[in-house]
From Swiss-Prot:
Positions bearing Phosphothreonine: T214
InterPro entries found in the cross-reference section: Leu-rich_rpt, Leu-rich_rpt_4, Leu-rich_rpt_typical-subtyp, LRR_dom_sf, RAM_signalling_pathway_SOG2, SDS22/Internalin_LRR
Gene name tied to this protein: SOG2
Gene Ontology terms: cellular component: cellular bud; cytoplasm; incipient cellular bud site; mating projection tip
Protein name per the record: Leucine-rich repeat-containing protein SOG2
Species this chain originates from: Saccharomyces cerevisiae (strain ATCC 204508 / S288c)
Function per UniProt: Required for proper cell morphogenesis and cell separation after mitosis. Functions in the RAM (regulation of ACE2 activity and cellular morphogenesis) signaling network and is required for proper ACE2 localization and CBK1 kinase activity.
Stretch list, region Disordered: 1-28, 454-506, 534-569
Cell location: Cytoplasm
Classification of source organism: Eukaryota, Fungi, Dikarya, Ascomycota, Saccharomycotina
Biased composition regions of type Basic and acidic residues, renumbered to the chain: 8-19
Composition skew (Low complexity), residue ranges: 469-486
Length: 791
């Protein structure tokens, strides 16, 4: 079940030792073994006491082995160790395999030099809660293979073992669901060595999830119909005298424990009326007392023999067709969210933070591909795969919850330097995706529950009819906001609440009139303040790509007055501004449609960079030309910055490829791997492509270092001739990247280790695609067209 470390044994010939070797005195046995092994070994630091039927070790025995560094007591019958065992101050390796320990002896935590501990094939259920400073700083390898560990909750103290690198948990009874959660939180492809994966992954998961959820006890449907409440005792057993009580109403519950304490009369509302049940003088409640009333006897008997519905875990059935439609809606939401978050992560300057999001996105991509395959199978085959669909959707939703948590935790790192237009688009994409999730939930939910949610938001929603809890984002403020409730999975909130935060409704967010006219006073989104930081609040009179020449002045006027005048005066002021804008537009010449389209497209390209591009006003030919130049200049800056990121990513991929190719060469030299006639030329082609990429990276990086500052030194590279040279270098660089991706994919089938590069290769492919889009919008495209056109 769990990845294991390699077997460690102190004696390779131990299997040939007699299994029935016995000794009545452990001291005599230890002395004789010491004498025997001292003759064969000059060091005297290694002692093997294997399969000697030792049942206990005395303080006297410890005195004989005080200088031992490696000790093996495997295949004995030990159940405890003496307190004097801590006197083994040099002990570094201890093998207690195949003994009878039911818990880890506390005295082992007091061994000052112990680094490797093998406790496999015992009956241990948990790690000790208290970990000494010796273990915190020294323990590197711990084997609990073939024990009685039933949950990773029992290993919570593993988070204190700072040096632990290898943890063996194979052949325990840990639920697969818990291991899946650990693997989902820390995927295998995060660069962790396989033998160290479980030690790091479980420790990381337990650190970030200190309070793991405890499964709720299941209640039988018959008990629910009869109005009884089942509660398990601490040991999991069911006691009829403690667990049966009558549920009086929807708001109150009379439990058995309350009836045991109180000697007063308790009023209980039944299905047909109200009765008073008096507890006995001793306070004990008899579980059968309820049936002594003939009024209820026949009724409850009839309820108790009603047939149970043939459903697993009490879930309500939905048709396969409904489930498929809902999964398609969720697939759309997953895809949109993934693309939006990927762009946000690509802009993050803190790569150590961004790599966590990228890792989760890669996991989402993998599960999404699996979801698409399962949906295709359901369409092409007669068999249904409902459980697989549900499991994949829940796994992806869990990953998105973790991603949103990371975005909220590092909010400023991801969003502080981003352009406002892009943040608005990102927010809108998430809102639309959540709305589609709500549509999927509504589609498979019962009609009465869906209609009831219009008047009162339910506490729990689910994507299938399972009892998967989720919270809702409710709209607030204003009549329009109260008409729609937007629900999302889990406690996911993109933006932290502040005094000026107000969650917009779907109608307010999707209002075309507000967006097109620039009047976004009803849309609370992010807006930059005077210091460049982001605050939450409404955007007043935002200037967009189709505003006229006076819009810049109007926006400044509104910003100046919005903090000093009342709301009614502000509305009148906005109305007068709108009238003046219409009057000025009536006397202005009609704008050229091509120019308008190009500027709108240029402004929309903000989603691939964090450089602010403000669409300029268009009042005439000269103004249009100057504004077009400004847009091109800003797009060029975007291009330089994105290319700089690509150069760094190519360097990372190059180093990884070089490392793997070197390993292949070394393995081939040592005879561990044979280079076939087909593999050798593939590796040569890949090596040559990487060399070309690094040469072009060097040339391009030299130019980018001069162009990015955008000062007087960059002018020498802004002539038509130099721009054409830069264009050719960029094109060659992008072609080489495509060749690297293609050649690496070809070699992957023969060299499986290259699969570890997939996340970085995927990111490189995506950002390269973004570069091609920006390159077509930049001024370099026009230079290349003019150079290639016939005179």
């Amino acid at each position: 079940m769990v990845a294991t470390s390699s077997k460690r044994t102190l004696d390779p010939k131990e299997e040939h030792l007699p299994a029935d070797k016995t000794s009545t005195n452990s001291s005599n046995t230890i002395i004789s073994e010491l004498a025997t092994q001292e003759k064969s070994s000059s060091s005297g630091t290694t002692l093997k006491l294997i399969a000697l039927n030792i049942k206990s070790i005395s303080d006297e025995d410890v005195g004989y082995i005080q200088n031992v560094e490696r000790l093996s007591l495997r295949k004995n019958h030990l159940t405890s160790l003496p307190a004097s065992f801590k006197r083994l101050s040099r002990l570094q390796y201890l093998d207690l395999h195949n003994n009878n320990f039911k818990e880890i002896p506390y005295i082992l935590t007091q061994c000052p030099q112990l680094e490797i501990l093998d406790l496999s094939s015992n009956e241990i259920e948990a790690l000790p809660d208290e970990i000494s400073s010796f273990w915190q700083d020294n323990i590197r390898v711990l084997s609990l293979k073939d024990n009685n560990v039933t949950s990773i909750r029992n290993l919570k103290s593993i988070t204190k073992l700072n040096k632990l690198s290898i943890l063996d948990l194979e052949d325990n009874k840990i639920p697969k669901e818990e291991l899946d959660q650990v693997q989902s939180y820390t995927p295998f492809h995060t660069g962790i060595p396989k033998e160290e994966y479980w030690a790091i992954a479980i420790s990381r998961y337990l650190k970030d999830h200190p309070n793991l959820p405890t499964p709720e006890p299941k209640i039988s449907r018959a008990a629910k119909r009869m109005g009884f409440i089942n509660t398990n005792l601490s040991n999991g057993a069911m006691n009829e005298n403690n667990i049966i009580s009558l549920a009086p109403s929807a708001n109150t519950t009379i439990s058995a424990s309350t009836a045991m304490v109180s000697s007063n009369q308790t009023s209980a509302t039944s299905f047909s009326g109200t009765v008073n049940a008096e507890s006995e003088q001793s306070g004990a409640v008899n579980g059968t007392e309820l049936y002594n009333h003939t009024k209820y006897n026949d009724y409850f008997k009839r309820l108790s023999i009603l047939p149970e519905e043939s459903m697993s875990n009490g879930h309500q059935k939905i048709s396969h067709a409904e489930l498929v439609v809902s999964c398609r809606k969720l697939l759309f939401s997953f895809t949109e969210c993934q693309q939006a978050i990927r762009k946000i992560a690509s802009f993050c300057k803190e790569k150590a933070v961004a790599v966590n999001v990228v890792s989760l996105l890669y996991s989402v991509r993998s599960h999404t591909d699996n979801l698409v395959e399962v949906l295709q199978q359901t369409e092409n085959e007669d068999e249904s795969h409902d459980q697989a669909l549900i499991k994949l959707c829940l796994t992806i939703i869990t990953n998105f919850k973790q991603i949103i948590t990371l975005l909220r935790k590092n909010f400023e790192i991801f969003f502080k330097e981003d352009d406002l237009c892009f943040i608005r688009m990102f927010y809108m994409t998430l809102m639309c995706a959540y709305m589609e999730m709500y549509n999927a939930w509504s589609f498979i939910k019962e009609d009465d529950q869906v209609s009831g949610s219009a008047s009162k938001a339910p506490k729990k929603h689910s994507f299938s009819r399972h009892e998967t809890s989720s919270s809702s984002i409710t709209s607030g403020g204003g009549p329009a906001a109260s008409t729609t409730s937007t629900h999302c999975s889990g406690n996911i909130k993109l933006l932290p609440k502040t005094r000026s935060t107000r969650t917009p409704s779907a109608s307010a967010l999707l209002s075309n009139s507000n967006i097109l006219t620039g009047d976004t006073t009803a849309v609370p989104l992010l807006s930059p303040n005077l210091n460049g930081a982001h605050t939450h609040g409404p955007i007043l009179g935002h200037q967009n790509a189709i505003s006229n020449g006076s819009s810049q002045t109007n926006m400044n006027e509104v910003k100046t007055t919005s903090d000093t005048i009342p709301r009614q005066q502000l509305l009148q002021h906005n109305k007068s501004i709108s009238d003046s804008k219409k009057e000025s537009q009536a006397h202005e010449p009609k704008q050229h449609p091509v120019m308008t389209s190009s500027i709108i497209n240029a402004s929309n390209s903000n989603n691939v960079s964090n450089v602010n591009i403000t669409p300029p006003p268009m009042n005439g030919g000269g103004a249009a030309n100057s504004s077009a130049n400004v847009v091109e200049t800003n797009i060029d800056i975007q291009l330089y910055q994105t290319l700089s990121t690509v150069v760094k990513m190519v360097s990372v991929v190059y180093n990884q490829l070089t490392s793997e190719i070197s390993k292949i060469a070394i393995a081939s030299t040592m005879g561990k791997q044979i280079l076939t006639d087909s593999l050798a030329p593939k590796i040569r082609d890949l090596t040559e492509t990487c060399r070309q990429a690094m040469d072009l990276s060097k040339q391009l990086n030299e130019r980018l270092n001069v162009l990015i500052p955008n000062d007087s030194n960059s002018e020498k590279y802004l002539t038509s001739l130099e721009k054409l040279k830069t264009w050719e270098i960029m094109n060659s660089f992008l072609k080489v990247i495509i060749s690297i991706l293609a050649n690496t994919k070809i070699v992957m089938s023969d060299v499986p280790n290259l699969n570890e590069l997939r996340p970085n290769l995927a990111n490189l492919a995506k950002i390269t695609k973004d570069v091609t889009v920006i390159l077509d919008l930049s001024s370099y495209k026009a230079v290349s067209v003019s150079a290639n056109s016939p005179e």
